[in-house]
Regions:
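Active-site histidine-anchored catalytic micro-motif
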Residues: 1-138
Length: 138
């Protein structure tokens, strides 16, 4: 069986990290599926999904690391095409990726004790994001 749900987010932009673990648990609790996999996917090219320990230190560390790897203020060919100044946003999202697959058993996500599922907004402006959540199993 396959079911499809959505998580709606209004982001502030620029390196915002949003914990969506509770939303995923809520969706699983409403699902008719008890065991399987949950696929989480963000449409678009400047947002990403990952897991981390959602705590204040890492919430600061991740954007700082991204700035070291893919700095905002350098030349990106994307900006030559679109003149929107978010070439770095696309590259950061590409590095992290748009999707996750998480197994679950008895309607419980199989995650580590300190592991949360997060959405990362890399664009330089706010967005309305509609994250697709596909539940597969029995």
């Amino acid at each position: 069986m396959i079911e499809l749900y959505y998580i709606e987010l209004n982001t502030k932009g620029r390196d915002e990290i949003i914990n969506i673990s509770d939303e995923l648990r809520n969706i699983l609790s409403k699902s008719n599926i008890t065991n399987g996999n949950i696929l989480v996917f963000v449409p678009g090219s400047t947002g990403a999904l990952s897991t981390l320990e959602y705590e204040p230190g890492l919430i600061k560390d991740v954007p700082e690391l991204m700035e070291k790897i893919i700095p905002e203020n350098r030349h990106y060919h994307h900006n030559d095409t679109w003149h929107d100044g978010n070439g770095y946003s696309h590259l950061r999202a590409t590095l992290i990726g748009p999707s996750l697959i998480i197994p679950f058993e008895k309607k419980m996500l199989i995650l580590g004790t300190w592991q949360q599922v997060v959405f990362l907004e890399f664009d330089n402006k706010p967005h309305h994001r509609r994250i697709a959540v596909q539940i597969m199993g029995e």
